[in-house]
């Protein structure tokens, strides 16, 4: 079972209806890159095909410190695989 913060459930999914918990979970389980934030949250980047889209995109998923509770997610147009 994938958990989500109230913010994700009430705000993010409303603003980005092409996202889902399942899509975010796939990114967390198969990341291209993982990076901790100063506040303890964890950023994951990975390929995901969003609902109603034909081509995969890079999605950034931010979890709480536990690494499983999803707090935010969005397509990241600025991601570069060769960047640190």
What are these regions (language model features)?
Residues 1-84:
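Ribonuclease/tRNase effector modules and their secretory precursors
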């Amino acid at each position: 079972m994938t958990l989500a913060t109230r913010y994700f459930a009430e705000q993010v999914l409303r603003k980005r209806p092409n996202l889902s918990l399942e899509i975010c979970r796939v990114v967390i389980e198969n990341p291209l890159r993982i990076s901790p934030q100063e506040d303890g949250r964890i950023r994951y980047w990975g390929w995901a095909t969003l609902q109603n889209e034909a081509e995969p995109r890079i999605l950034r998923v931010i979890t709480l410190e536990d690494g499983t509770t999803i707090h935010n997610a969005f397509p990241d147009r600025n991601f570069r695989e060769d960047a640190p």
